[in-house]
């Protein structure tokens, strides 16, 4: 069993989180948000570039990939971004440093149908490139066709009933 400290270190080193509510910190800019996991994890810091300038380049690459030009948006407070833009900042934060697992809770809920599939394809492409496993929770059953494996928790619960 891991100690609390080692458990925290394992989580930050190996798991990227994409929360439904984004959990963006109001006083951080876009780049600072994306780089946050690298401030807590030496492994993700090394994977993302290992120098401040290469870290910033990787953060900018992810933001650009997700349709947020850092030069255009970096001056805005996170509260001034649209909900969809905030969600993309949170996605870049989850992806930085190549975690082995990304846990995503309703990551497409704030996106319109046009952007939903494009967003997922970008996440899938980055996960495939970095050999990252994506576990996503969603109530949107129309997205199930995009995944290799789908588990219906309602069915799962019934199977486990005594």
Predicted segments — roles?
Residues 49-72:
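Conserved ABC ATPase "signature" region
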Residues 77-81, 85:
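Conserved ABC ATPase signature
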Residues 91:
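Hydrophobic anchor residue at the start of the ABC signature
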Residues 98:
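Conserved catalytic motifs of ABC-family nucleotide-binding domains
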């Amino acid at each position: 069993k891991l100690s609390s400290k080692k458990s925290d270190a394992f989580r930050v080193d190996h798991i990227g989180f994409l929360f439904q509510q984004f959990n963006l910190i109001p006083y951080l800019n876009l780049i600072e948000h994306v780089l946050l996991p690298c401030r807590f994890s030496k492994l993700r810091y090394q994977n993302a570039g290992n120098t401040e300038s290469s870290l910033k380049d990787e953060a900018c690459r992810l933001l650009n990939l997700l349709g947020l030009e850092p030069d255009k948006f970096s001056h805005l407070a996170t509260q001034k971004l649209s909900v969809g833009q905030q969600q993309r900042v949170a996605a870049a934060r989850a992806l930085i440093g190549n975690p082995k697992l990304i846990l995503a809770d309703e990551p497409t809920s704030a996106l319109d149908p046009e952007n939903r599939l494009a967003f997922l394809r970008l996440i899938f492409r980055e996960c495939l490139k970095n050999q990252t496993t994506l576990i996503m929770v969603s109530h949107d059953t129309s997205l199930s066709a995009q995944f290799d494996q789908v588990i219906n928790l309602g069915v799962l619960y019934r199977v486990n009933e005594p």
